[in-house]
């Protein structure tokens, strides 16, 4: 049964879905790492693929940018396509010298000023949690492959372009600092909220693509094709 946003049938998706923001990164992962790949959806250019990795079925699908977008796609995957696990694999901007360009971050919580969870389910908190069992599997995969992980809270922002404010610190800066956020992205708070509401599992691996404490940045092509450590960690976990 297809949904308004996913043109697939039940059984087209594996129980575990890797979810980058960029649909072209989803295609790159499918083409580079998976065998017996088939495209299962492409509504609005949001590509999704199912194949196998080391003999295990796995799917990969783009989420788009921001919480409303990943909120729709992840909810439909969990609710209507019997997906049990979604691992976001995305890029992030570092808030600290501890997380340098191309480092891999494993989120232990997603902090946000967003009202996504309050509007959706009445949840009033400012932090949503990943699945601890999924995080344990990702840690084991990283250790097996010798890929270091930096762990901690991340900031899920609703806004990419913020206007200057006379208030110092601003609400989001205070929230970021109080929660000790390592980096900023725009999706995981909603993904974790969906998983909690629906009794499913979600996790988030991020590659540092730019920094608020360093002038270094990555190119669009690097973000699409070069963030392979987090891909290998997510693919290598035993779900």
Predicted regions located by residue number:
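Metabolite-binding pocket within alpha/beta catalytic cores that recognizes anionic/polar moieties
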Residues: 1-137, 144
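Glycine-rich beta-alpha junction loops
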Residues: 23, 93, 155-161, 190, ...
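Expand to "…catalyze enediolate/carbanion chemistry for C-C bond making/breaking, isomerization
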Residues: 79, 164-166, 217-218
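Short acidic/glycine-rich loop or secondary-structure boundary segments that cap or lie
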Residues: 95-97, 113-115, 158-165, 213
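Active-site rim beta-loop-alpha module in soluble metabolic enzymes
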Residues: 127-180
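Generic non-transmembrane alpha-helical segments
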Residues: 137-145, 194, 233-237
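A C-terminal functional module that forms or caps the active site or interfaces directly
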Residues: 166, 170-203, 209
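His/Asp/Glu-rich mid-to-C-terminal helical/loop segments that flank catalytic regions of hydrolases
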Residues: 212-239
